């Protein structure tokens, strides 16, 4: 079952990852004219610790890299966009203990390796997002069915356009611990169902919307 990770265990990893993300943001802007903003998903934000681990397993931090603007060449070729982000990340982590970014369906994952242990203890995931005309966030999804049959598309995240405002309202009204409980229950519910289609970011949005609608 999922449980929360204590803040003191998260702090140093968050500092390292934020530094890498700052370098990534700057490199994308300077080399490719890709203007982005990055943020920790609500499950990892400062003073909002909702980072979880399954049992005694490893944990990760989830980052959103939101596209603000970029040349049409990238809008028209989403594979090129994801490859550019991953290649840029690899240049940055090349001199660290983090591995090159591994591509998956919805994120790029970098793993921290320890010299004294081959066991993976920490990783961080980067999801690439952009907003559609409705203001909702859309995640870049890589549907890989083999080298000759793959596609890239934006997948809308429902009810995500004002989730930050709702989360701020919950926190301001002393409801953050209740949100933590809802979020953890949902994480364990999807775990019991063996549902891999609800990453932390989606569960966080579901939890915020559910609790906000309950109280406001």
Placement of each model-derived feature along the sequence:
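Alpha-helix boundary/N-cap detector
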Residues: 8, 12-15, 19, 76, ...
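Helical scaffold of the NTase/Pol beta-like nucleotidyltransferase catalytic core
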Residues: 1-42
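Amphipathic alpha-helical segments that form well-ordered structural scaffolds
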Residues: 20-23, 84-88, 207
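Conserved catalytic core of two-metal-ion nucleotidyltransferases
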Residues: 28-32, 79-134
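Active-site nucleotide-donor binding segment shared across nucleotidyl transfer reactions
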Residues: 28-61, 65-75
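UBC/E2-like fold recognition across ubiquitin and ubiquitin-like conjugation systems
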Residues: 3-4, 54, 69, 204
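Short glycine-rich, low-complexity/disordered patches
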Residues: 24-41, 94-109, 191-206, 214-216
